[in-house]
Amino acid sequence: MLVDSFNRVIDYIRVSVTKQCNFRCQYCMPTTPLDFFDDEELLPLDNVLEFLKIAIDEGVKKIRITGGEPLLRKGLDEFIAKLHAYNKEVALVLSTNGFSLKKMAKGLKDAGLSRVNVSLDSLKSDRVLKISQKDALKNTLEGIEESLKVGLKLKLNTVVMKGVNDDEILELLEYAKNRSIQIRYIEFMENTHAKSLVKGLKEKEILDLIAQKYKIMGMEKPKQGSSKIYTLENGYQFGIIAPHSDDFCQSCNRIRLASDGKICPCLYYQDAIDAKEAIINKDTKMMKRLLKQSIINKPEKNMWNDKNGGTPTRAFYYTGG
């Protein structure tokens, strides 16, 4: 079992398999050239697999595959299948923009993926183009429908931005509710790569908009997890991830392995342990030592409200968001 200095059990690891992405979203990397990562030096997935086997043996119960856009990484199906074969009890989930999901959904399901989280920030093609700099809505919606067809579980993630998509909160909720998919609204998380371009809505503002149409009956906050779950009068549940309004540091159970081999104990924490050499060499003892050291290094709280260091300079697409 992995336990940090504040007696939190760490049983969830987010793994970025690439920094590359075919979107340039306003809230992530809006000004990064599309060919910026063409020379990215990727960690071999078989080596990453060995690191994750160690993490599983030490008590990790959930692995999320992220990026960048993870569906751009070649050999992903096989990687997931090997992870699933190693321990079928571990939940394997993936976050994606959905652009390539239609052609990959069945392969991901067959490989053993438990669930896919799809970013859906608008149901209007022109807005998706404005937000992501990609004419992508048709592909993303088709990917969602194909996932439902093949039986792959889904959640939707929406970053709510003032004057951009905040007038679609109810429409997006209806879209998700009609398909029995949970949607999670996310407060915009500032980073130096998108800080000045976007203003987000806070949790209360999102709830006020939903309450204009629906009666919200109650809220529950899972012991572990980043989202609060709200229940409507008709029984439908949606989530809000509100790190600004109410951080979840006290119950945080996760660390991150970035695509460059750094183990990051917190998304909003600059210090990371470089495990690249150990992973490349498949040095089991060193990988285990560095994993445990990263758990010890995990801070009690993020630095969100620290005026001297609250906005991270490490982009989220490096650490997997």
Swiss-Prot record:
Residue ranges constituting the Radical SAM core domain according to the UniProt record: 5-233
PROSITE patterns: MOAA_NIFB_PQQE, RADICAL_SAM
Coiled-coil ranges per UniProt: none
CDD domains according to UniProt: Radical_SAM, Twitch_MoaA
Gene3D superfamilies assigned to the protein according to its UniProt record, in alphabetical order: Aldolase class I
EC class of the enzyme, as a word: lyase
EC number: 4.1.99.22
Binding of GTP, residues: R14, R64, S95, K155, R254, I255, R256
Cofactor note: Binds 2 [4Fe-4S] clusters. Binds 1 [4Fe-4S] cluster coordinated with 3 cysteines and an exchangeable S-adenosyl-L-methionine and 1 [4Fe-4S] cluster coordinated with 3 cysteines and the GTP-derived substrate.
Keywords assigned: 4Fe-4S, GTP-binding, Iron, Iron-sulfur, Lyase, Metal-binding, Molybdenum cofactor biosynthesis, Nucleotide-binding, S-adenosyl-L-methionine
Pathway where it operates: Cofactor biosynthesis; molybdopterin biosynthesis
Catalytic activity: GTP + AH2 + S-adenosyl-L-methionine = (8S)-3',8-cyclo-7,8-dihydroguanosine 5'-triphosphate + 5'-deoxyadenosine + L-methionine + A + H(+)
GO molecular function, one term: GTP 3',8'-cyclase activity
List of residues binding [4Fe-4S] cluster 2: C249, C252, C266
Amino acids binding [4Fe-4S] cluster 1: C21, C25, C28
Protein residues bound to S-adenosyl-L-methionine: Y27, G68, S119, M189
Similarity comment: Belongs to the radical SAM superfamily. MoaA family.
Oligomeric and partner information: Monomer and homodimer.
Role description: Catalyzes the cyclization of GTP to (8S)-3',8-cyclo-7,8-dihydroguanosine 5'-triphosphate.
Protein name, entry field: GTP 3',8-cyclase
